Amino acid sequence: MKKFFSLFIGFLFFGIATFLIVAPAIVDDGANVVVAHQPYEISERAAALHSSLLVGDWHADSLLWMRDLTEQYDYGHLDFPRMQQGNMALQMFTTVTKSPSGQNYKRNSSDASDNITLLAMTQRWPVATWTSLAERALFQADKLHELADRDPENLMLIRSRDELADYLQRRQSSPKLIGGLLGTEGSHALDGDLNNIQRLFDRGFRMMSLQHFFDNKLGGSLHGTSGEGLTQFGRDAVTQMLALEIMLDVSHSSEQVVIDTLAMSNKPLLVSHTGFQGHCQSPRNISDGLMQQIAAAGGLIAVGYWEGAICGNSPATVAAAIVYGIELVGEDHIALGSDFDGSVTTSLDGSELAAITQALLDANLSEQQIRKVMGENMLTYLQTYLP
């Protein structure tokens, strides 16, 4: 009996260990999907143009997962080798800290059980992250810092205009060097404590999204239950963020939060991953009128790559959303915001971004317009508004 019990315990621990090793990759593979496709045809003109671009992306959730981004994988959307194959230069790495059970674009309760808690446990994150959203953001930030320290030839962390200038100088002789920035996916990452704004800033965060898929202490989500604007806590948080020159992202904010933030911000707003209602009537997207107000105040609108935002799953659909955005708000206000590794299905991964350049040429955009959208608008914004 004693021998049987020992064998049972051994098998139990083996099963648990196997689960903890295998499960994160299975979840990642199932969440971050690339539609099966034949290799995209890239013309000589598109290939030459793409290789000359500075490509920047405002939104990827790659730090959420257990992948070592220095290695190339056959699942998920991003890692350094694939980014380099796609000629990626600037990437905003966003940190997901809470995802409500049953998450959808229409209505989510802030009291719903949280998917990220189980993911954090399964991926063996520090125990402090199991109960603190701030610790989850800080842990993911530390992952990016560790990558920059371990692989300085391929990644440089950017926190200021001076560091951005240094990065651009280094990239002239090291064209595969990636410039990484940090942002939050919702300011519930503050854990309801304004002091955490400084903690996150000190750890390198330079963009903060106000909401995600549910209402939080700052105000209503576009996909929440209240539809409310900024609360007093939200106004206080925005004031402190602006004082630290943190860039504000309203991607998932209620329309009233966007209106309130526009009224009080002295810095143009970002919509880091989105589509346009006039192009794709989805509850994921705010109204075209608000998009025009954001752009009129100097803001940037970054177009995503997934069906829920652009009503299609092809490079041509991404290009169509971009063309619509240019017609709506102007070529100086459109950028890329893939939402790579954000539990979405896309038509390409980070190695295939030349397919977007090809699609934009096919849509008759000029090379100047393509340069702006693919990264120069992002660069200009960062050069202007980073601390």
Question: Over which residues does each language-model region extend?
Answer:
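N-terminal hydrophobic targeting/anchoring segments and the immediately downstream early-domain regions
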Residues: 2-209, 213-225, 281-291, 295-336, ...
